[in-house]
Regions:
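Conserved catalytic or regulatory cores that recognize and/or transform ribose-phosphate-containing ligands
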Residues: 15-147, 152-361
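Cysteine-centered motifs
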Residues: 3-4
Length: 361
């Protein structure tokens, strides 16, 4: 039931022209609330779907050279400390369009410091859900641990491309990694690329580091793997999918879409819209995790205008295809784009904070 000032309740038999007539007579701030209620109350959550899927590439494996991710493509040949770093260098120069979609866990280095993420595994599941492919080069203790976790998680294993160094098999003695996760993935027809490359291990100050044995064979290997990855990733890309409220990445994209439609939202507004209007349970802690992730992925940004507002970036084109409940209250052409443009005009006229946050004042 939607209420208007001095108008009582809007009856279920009122048609859209009646709403527009009422909008002209009530205050603008109330009009914003009315349009918000009409939009959210008529969404049929079970029938919405995902569009414009970002198709990120979540790339895991050995360490990279230094901490500055922007300098990956400037590393000197022969100075790589992991195969992952060498392949990233290759993609940045030979597959530039694909490289733009690469996600590195290092980009989220402050996840623990700011207590944005409950635990690393759940966070990686979220990132993997947003990706079209998860590339894991099995090199180093961290990558071995990720292989064990990723191989048994359906959300990740279906997208997993594993690159495995057979040089880890010494004198025919296979390890747990070989008999366990690798065999499990191959048995379930997942992509496992078996290669071999030399690694030089160094012990310094009680810490083990590694360098790649860079030679012509390794250079040819990097070119081969880069070509293989480009082909395999292209085969996994898709633009649409069914929405599920049980899938963290789908919920994350729903949050991004609400920010896109409403153009400027506070945290509590997002939580209210999802919990109370869409009837989806979402804890504030998890919502903050989604907002943190979306910000680091460049899909939203923050702006303080008295309160903190979350705004869409140019990369955020909306991710939800809405379906609305059948109702005589709505016109056939009612859409999220109509709501977005109408709300923007309302903000300019009578919402100083949002207009300022959006650079409209």
């Amino acid at each position: 039931v939607i209420c208007c000032r001095n108008r009582g309740h809007l009856g279920k038999d009122l048609k859209w022209p009646h709403y527009e007539a009422i909008f002209k007579r009530v205050g603008l701030m109330e009009t914003i609330n009315q349009l918000t209620s009409i939009f959210l109350n008529h969404i049929e959550v079970e029938k919405i779907s995902l569009r414009n899927l970002p198709n990120y590439i979540f790339f895991c494996g050995g360490g990279i050279n230094g901490d500055d991710l922007s300098k990956i493509n400037t590393s000197e040949l022969g100075e790589f400390n992991s195969l992952r770093c060498a392949i990233l260098h290759y993609l940045s120069s030979q597959e530039k369009e694909l490289y733009q979609d690469v996600i590195l866990a290092e980009k989220f280095h402050d996840w623990l410091d700011d207590a944005n993420i409950n635990n690393l595994i759940d966070f990686e599941v979220l990132l993997a859900g947003l990706a079209t492919a998860v590339i894991l080069i099995v090199e180093g203790p961290g990558a071995h641990a990720e292989l064990g976790a990723f191989s048994v998680m359906p959300q990740i294993s279906s997208k997993l491309i594993t690159i495995y160094n057979v040089n880890s098999i010494k004198n025919g003695q296979r390890t747990f990694i070989e008999w366990g996760p690798i065999k499990f993935l191959e048995k379930n027809e997942k992509i496992v690329l078996r290669h071999e490359w030399g690694v030089i291990y160094q012990l310094e100050d009680n810490a083990i580091s590694q360098l790649i044995d860079y030679n012509d064979d390794f250079k040819a290997l990097v070119n081969l793997i880069g070509t293989q990855l480009a082909k395999d990733i292209q085969g996994k890309s898709k633009k649409t999918a069914v929405f599920s409220r049980e899938t963290p990445s789908d919920m994350c994209l729903l949050v991004a879409d609400l920010v896109y439609v409403f153009s400027a939202l506070k945290l509590r507004e997002i939580k209210t819209y999802i919990n109370e209007y869409l009837k989806i349970d979402l804890e504030e802690k998890i919502l903050k995790e989604y907002l943190y992730s979306l910000k680091n992925l460049g899909l939203i940004k923050e702006k303080n205008a008295g309160a903190k507002y979350f705004l869409p970036t140019e990369k955020n084109k909306g991710f939800i295809k809405y379906q609305f409940k059948s109702s005589p209250d709505l016109p056939n052409n009612f859409s999220a784009n109509y709501v977005k443009s109408t709300l923007l005009s309302f903000y300019i006229k009578d919402d100083n904070e949002r207009a300022y946050a959006l650079g409209l004042r």
